[in-house]
């Protein structure tokens, strides 16, 4: 009911706030026998970690994960896996001036109206800091899917503002702080971020995720369609405002003769559907795009109200990302992995004997 859990067989429950003592999660449903250590989770956590680039937030957190349960002699036991990450570099005093104000574009207003109380320090539970535990849980799913089924899940920055970044190379994605696959776009991205920092503003971004070697049959129509669950998971990420699957919204300009993925004995000729038909994976790569809004915490003064419903001006202090898309790549990968892991285990439970 409280919306802190995702999944039916592979279940992930997260807890913690941006400026609380720690972040944590419980992962239930991991099959036994998977070799797993903190090192397996730390790689993706380091990719998401704040303070690793001059282009992201200056908050510096080691994000070192500890495994509390579910592992014995280096392998999963099939019981619940408990993970925890302690917060270190939180500066709650940065938010003391706005504790009675509602930051426009944030969850301050809606949390206050819904619960009658909110943690104003860094956004509390609504902060993107919460996604660290999703990345840790997603790393477990990614490892299992890859080792047992050869499934790979990778993402890259495909647009920042009006800078389009077409795919060029997966190797290049990990060679720059933007997760951009096109080296020719790096200078333009750098200049844009520098300019935004100078004027105290922010920009939106688009992330593309591609999952390969997906077996046919994942997804449960009607209400648990694979594309519906993937959209739900991706839209649950902070600042996500839109999801496209396959050709997405460009289908409105296509004709049926163009969009349909014709089939031959060798397989599908095209992949306009993004690897999902009728809510079920068709064996082609799953292609997704997520649009992220500009960061709402900026230095530019803006209009808002306080708790007394009085009109005021607000300038948000603190340490914030000029573009949340820069750290969204491992988060989107994690959410796709969690959904695919859950659906694969559900498929195995229902259809393994056919």
UniProtKB/Swiss-Prot annotation:
NADP(+) binds at residues 48, 54. FMN binds at residues 125-127, 238-239, 278, 293-297, 319. The keyword NAD does not apply. It catalyses: 5-O-(1-carboxyvinyl)-3-phosphoshikimate = chorismate + phosphate. It holds the Pfam family Chorismate_synt. It is an enzyme of class 4 (lyase). GO terms for cellular component: cytosol. One of its GO terms (biological process) is chorismate biosynthetic process. Gene3D superfamilies: Chorismate synthase AroC. Pathway: Metabolic intermediate biosynthesis; chorismate biosynthesis; chorismate from D-erythrose 4-phosphate and phosphoenolpyruvate: step 7/7. Reduced FMN (FMNH(2)). Its EC number is 4.2.3.5. The keyword Flavoprotein applies. GO terms for molecular function: chorismate synthase activity; FMN binding. Its cofactor is FMNH2. Transmembrane segments: none annotated. Keywords: Amino-acid biosynthesis, Aromatic amino acid biosynthesis, FAD, Flavoprotein, FMN, Lyase, NADP. Homotetramer. This reaction introduces a second double bond into the aromatic ring system. Belongs to the chorismate synthase family. HAMAP family: Chorismate_synth. This is Chorismate synthase. It comes from Buchnera aphidicola subsp. Acyrthosiphon pisum (strain APS) (Acyrthosiphon pisum symbiotic bacterium). The lineage of its organism: Bacteria, Pseudomonadati, Pseudomonadota, Gammaproteobacteria, Enterobacterales.
């Amino acid at each position: 009911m409280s919306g802190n859990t995702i999944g039916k067989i592979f279940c992930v429950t997260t807890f913690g706030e941006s400026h609380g003592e720690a972040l944590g999660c419980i992962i239930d449903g991991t099959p036994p026998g998977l070799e797993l250590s903190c090192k397996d989770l730390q790689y993706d956590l380091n990719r998401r970690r704040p303070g690793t680039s001059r282009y992201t937030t200056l908050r510096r957190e080691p994000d070192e994960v500890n495994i509390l349960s579910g592992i014995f002699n280096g392998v999963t036991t099939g019981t619940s896996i408990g993970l925890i990450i302690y917060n270190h570099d939180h500066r709650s005093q940065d938010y003391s001036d706005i504790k009675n104000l509602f930051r426009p574009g944030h969850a301050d207003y809606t949390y206050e109206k819904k619960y009658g109380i909110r943690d104003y320090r860094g956004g509390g539970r609504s902060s993107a800091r919460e996604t660290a535990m999703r990345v840790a849980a997603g790393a477990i799913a990614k490892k299992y899917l890859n080792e047992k089924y050869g499934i790979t899940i990778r993402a890259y920055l495909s647009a920042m503002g009006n800078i389009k970044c077409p795919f060029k190379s997966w190797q290049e994605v990990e060679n720059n702080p933007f997760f951009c696959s096109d080296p020719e776009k790096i200078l333009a991205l750098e200049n844009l971020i520098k300019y935004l920092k100078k004027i105290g503003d922010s920009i939106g971004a688009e992330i593309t995720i591609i999952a390969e070697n997906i077996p046919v049959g994942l997804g449960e129509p009607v209400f648990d369609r694979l594309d519906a669950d993937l959209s739900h998971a991706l839209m649950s990420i902070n600042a996500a405002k839109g999801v496209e699957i396959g050709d997405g919204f460009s289908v409105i300009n296509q004709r049926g003769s163009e969009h349909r993925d014709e089939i031959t004995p060798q397989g599908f000729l095209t992949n306009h559907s993004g690897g999902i038909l009728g809510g079920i994976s068709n064996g082609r790569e799953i292609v997704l795009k997520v649009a992220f809004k500009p960061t709402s915490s900026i230095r530019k003064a803006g209009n808002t109200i306080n708790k007394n419903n009085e009109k005021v001006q607000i300038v948000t202090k603190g340490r914030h990302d000029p573009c949340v898309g820069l750290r969204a790549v491992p988060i989107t990968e994690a959410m796709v992995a969690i959904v695919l892991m859950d659906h694969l285990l559900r498929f195995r439970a229902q259809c393994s004997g056919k």
